[in-house]
Amino acid sequence: MKKIIFVLIFALVSAHSLADSGKFNASGAGSWAVNVMDGGNGNMSITYDGNAGLSDKEGSIFDKSTMHCIGGLTLVAGKFDDETGMCTFYLMDGEKVFINYKGKGTGGQGGSGDFVIVGGTGKYEKISGTGFSSRQNLKGKSLSLIHI
């Protein structure tokens, strides 16, 4: 397995329903272990498993949370439209929130997509919502360092 470090600029905007409804806008950075099968000419299959720390406005359920995501995508001529995955958000109050996501983008540049909040634990057991996420790739100083 090839290990690559990712820095994630992750923006999430979502409406979620609890006793109330609202929006959140979180950002963060993290690192991912990546498996890559390179077919040449911008054709690759990629799977990843990683963690990130997030921040949001003070008092938001996602402020000072961490997330663990597992997903994958297939690049064809340097572009992808099939990214899928799932994330667990570990909240400061000890609870968890789960999302599924789909995305598209360009290898080495970034991507965006939609996500669905599929549930949580404890007081967030019935949480639901949808939203949009995006990431921007940054250039690393070495070939083994990739930033997204």
Language-model region placement:
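Positively charged n-region of N-terminal signal peptides that target proteins for export
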Residues: 1-4
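Extracellular or lumenal secretory-pathway regions
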Residues: 17-90, 141
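Acidic, glycine-rich flexible loop segments
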Residues: 84, 90-138
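Conserved small/polar residues in nucleotide/adenosyl-binding loops
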Residues: 146-148
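Sec-dependent N-terminal signal peptides
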Residues: 6-8
